[in-house]
C-alpha cells in the first residue's frame, strides 16, 4: 500500500516481485486519460501503468483483501455465477429470501409451488413468474421480471432480466437475455434467427 515504484503485468510466478494483483477499481486524473494515444491499442496494465512508473508520476495503490476472479470470457462469467449460487465465492451472499432449502426469491414473485420442480441452488428475481409444469435445475439464476412458461426447463443457466422461456423450451447451461442466448463456448443465438430451435423472448412483450 502506498506509491507504486515498480509494475509488472502478469509476470511469470518465478519472476514476480510481489504476490499482489492489479485489479479492482482504478481512479484516474483527467490528465492521465490524455496520455492515452488514439488510433492504436493501448493497454492499462501493459502500457499505461509502466509508463506512469517510468515517468515518475504519482501512482498509488491499496491492498484490499477480496477474492479476485477473471471473467474475461463468456465461459468464465457462467462459471463464476455457478460458484456464487453454490456459495463458493467469499463475501457474496444470495439476495432475496430463502423460502426453501437452496431456493431464494425476490419480491412479488408468482410461483405455482405445488406444480413446479425447483432444485437448488436457485435465485428467482423480483417480479418473476414460474408457471405450473416448469422445471428449474440449479445452480440457476433468474433475474427480475422473468417468465417461465408451463413445460419449460432451465438447467444450470442464467436468465437476465425480463427473459421469457416459452413452453417446451429447454435452456441448458446458457446465459439468456430477451434478445440472445449464449452457450458456454461463446456461441450466440439471436431472437428471430432462422433455424433456431429455442423459443424465448421478452417477458414484457
What are these regions (language model features)?
Residues 1-40:
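Conserved core of the sugar-phosphate nucleotidyltransferase
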Amino acid at each position: 500500500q502506498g506509491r507504486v515504484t515498480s509494475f509488472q503485468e502478469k509476470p511469470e510466478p518465478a519472476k514476480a516481485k510481489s504476490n499482489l494483483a492489479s485489479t479492482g477499481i482504478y481512479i484516474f486524473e483527467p490528465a492521465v486519460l490524455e496520455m492515452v494515444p488514439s488510433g492504436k491499442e493501448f493497454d492499462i496494465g501493459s502500457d499505461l501503468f509502466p509508463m506512469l512508473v517510468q515517468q515518475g508520476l504519482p501512482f498509488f495503490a491499496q491492498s484490499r483483501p477480496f477474492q479476485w476472479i477473471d471473467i474475461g470470457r463468456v465461459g468464465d462469467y457462467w462459471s463464476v455465477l455457478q460458484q456464487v449460487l453454490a456459495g463458493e465465492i467469499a463475501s457474496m451472499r444470495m439476495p432475496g429470501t430463502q423460502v426453501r432449502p437452496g431456493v431464494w426469491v425476490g419480491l412479488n414473485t408468482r410461483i405455482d409451488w405445488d406444480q413446479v420442480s425447483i432444485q437448488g441452488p436457485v435465485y428467482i428475481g423480483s417480479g418473476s413468474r414460474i408457471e405450473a409444469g416448469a422445471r428449474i435445475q440449479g445452480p440457476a439464476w433468474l433475474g427480475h421480471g422473468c417468465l417461465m412458461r408451463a413445460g419449460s426447463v432451465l438447467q444450470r443457466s442464467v436468465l437476465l432480466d425480463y427473459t421469457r422461456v416459452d413452453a417446451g423450451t429447454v435452456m441448458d447451461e446458457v446465459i439468456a437475455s430477451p434478445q440472445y442466448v449464449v452457450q458456454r463456448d461463446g456461441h450466440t443465438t439471436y431472437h428471430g434467427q432462422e433455424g433456431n430451435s429455442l423459443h424465448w423472448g421478452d417477458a414484457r412483450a
